């Protein structure tokens, strides 16, 4: 339950952009009310994130909110960043974009290079540590900021830059387009981007009775209610939006004294037990439960190596009720029982992790309480090791 579910000690993905890519609604329902947007973000974000992951969503909510009352992307960016603690790495990363934009106002690629060089190493997400993949909120928000600043209000140019920056390059340009859509209004969006939506405007999304038209109306009504709730006025012809000073959010910084030092590519299978030793103060196993019905172990192994992981198989079983129970013993003591559902919508892609152990040598043993090796195996893709002492120039081991 939140906020524990979003805490980095319980969630290796705490700094990821999960909330950031869902936070559009936060600013849309608080038009021009950046402080209220931040308060909503604080309530919702800790379901799945904390620290920089929380700030990523708060930042996006602030962008949308500010875009209702400002028409300068640089000013919108400044307003969205006001509530983020300056001591946080998230703030520092986005602030670097602002500084680099002033230094290289016509060269977004140089800005991109400098940001990647300084902020492009993931710490928590097992899919990205010591790899090129990076779902960390701050660098993806930095690419949003780059699109807004270097795009100079041009809808297509802004989204193109955000896309070409890479990483989560569907969500980042979508955020940029959404913020500019608010700033420009529907009539200000170029026909090239606007007209295709007309064809699907009234079509319900699959599995729902909600269309773009209905969703827009829901959002509009939410915004009016929140405006009135905060002392604003709504009439048939006019809306008066109340504003309030922005308060800086509490400081949250994940993975303190926890630096990735080694990635050990295992490509191994656990049928009943699995053991390993390491030196440091933490570990995170990237892997998942795999159902062998309809596929062979060899096929699963080949696909896992090709895709740098077996995540594809964790998404495959939508109705399987099996739940694996894995005991995790650290230094001879039972630390946790990891619950791994086979059902795709309840999947868990890290069988076990532990941070902030005493620095030193540790042993880990996993024991499967309810194994069924004829139907289920646990894939161990890789293990990331952590230390309280950062190291340089160590990237990957296979």
Model-derived features: where do they sit?
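Accessory carbohydrate-recognition regions in carbohydrate-active enzymes
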Residues: 1-10, 14-19, 257, 393
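Acidic, carboxylate-rich catalytic segments that either coordinate divalent cations
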Residues: 91-130, 183-271
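Short, conserved phosphate-binding/catalytic loop or strand-edge motifs used
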Residues: 36-44, 58, 197
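Beta-strand-rich ligand-recognition modules
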Residues: 306-390
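Glycan-recognition and processing domains
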Residues: 236-280, 286-323, 389-398
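Stable alpha-helical elements in mature extracytoplasmic
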Residues: 20, 37, 56, 73-76, ...
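Accessory "access/gating" subregions that flank catalytic or transport cores
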Residues: 4-14, 23-33, 42-47, 62-166
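Catalytic phosphate/nucleotide-handling subdomain of diverse soluble enzymes
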Residues: 49-52, 59-61, 143-224
């Amino acid at each position: 339950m939140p906020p524990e579910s979003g805490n980095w000690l319980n969630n290796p993905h705490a700094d990821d952009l999960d909330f950031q890519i869902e936070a559009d609604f936060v600013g849309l329902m608080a038009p021009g009310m950046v402080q209220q947007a931040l308060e909503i973000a604080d309530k919702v974000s800790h379901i799945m994130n904390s620290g920089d992951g929380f700030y990523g969503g708060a930042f996006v909510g602030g962008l949308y909110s500010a875009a209702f009352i400002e028409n300068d992307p640089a000013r919108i960016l400044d307003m969205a960043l006001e509530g983020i603690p300056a001591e946080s790495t998230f703030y520092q990363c986005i602030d670097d974009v602002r500084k680099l934009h002033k230094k290289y106002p016509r060269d977004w690629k140089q800005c991109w290079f400098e940001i990647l060089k300084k902020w492009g190493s993931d710490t928590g997400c097992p899919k990205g540590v010591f790899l090129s993949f990076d779902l960390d909120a701050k660098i993806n928000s930095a690419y949003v900021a780059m699109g807004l600043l270097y795009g100079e209000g041009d809808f297509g140019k802004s989204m193109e830059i955000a896309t070409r920056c890479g990483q989560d390059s569907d969500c980042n340009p979508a955020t940029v387009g959404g913020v500019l859509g608010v700033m420009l209004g529907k009539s200000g969006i170029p026909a090239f981007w606007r007209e295709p939506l007309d064809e699907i405007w009234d079509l319900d999304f699959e599995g729902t009775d909600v269309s773009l038209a209905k969703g827009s109306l829901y959002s509009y009504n939410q915004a009016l209610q929140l405006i009135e709730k905060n002392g604003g006025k709504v009439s048939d012809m006019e809306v008066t939006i109340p504003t309030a000073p922005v308060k800086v959010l509490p400081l949250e910084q994940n993975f303190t004294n926890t630096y990735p030092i080694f990635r050990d590519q295992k490509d191994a299978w656990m049928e009943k037990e699995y053991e390993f030793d390491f030196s440091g103060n933490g570990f995170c196993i990237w892997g998942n439960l795999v159902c062998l019905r309809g596929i062979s172990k060899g096929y699963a192994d080949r696909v896992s190596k090709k895709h740098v992981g077996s995540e594809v198989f964790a998404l495959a079983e939508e109705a399987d009720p099996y739940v694996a129970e894995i005991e995790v013993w650290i230094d001879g003591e039972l630390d946790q029982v990891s619950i791994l559902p086979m059902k795709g919508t309840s999947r868990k892609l890290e069988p076990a992790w532990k941070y902030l152990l005493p620095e030193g040598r540790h042993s880990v043993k996993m024991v499967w309480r309810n194994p069924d090796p004829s139907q289920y195996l646990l894939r161990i893709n890789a293990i990331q090791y952590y230390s309280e002492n950062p190291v340089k120039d160590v990237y990957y081991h296979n």
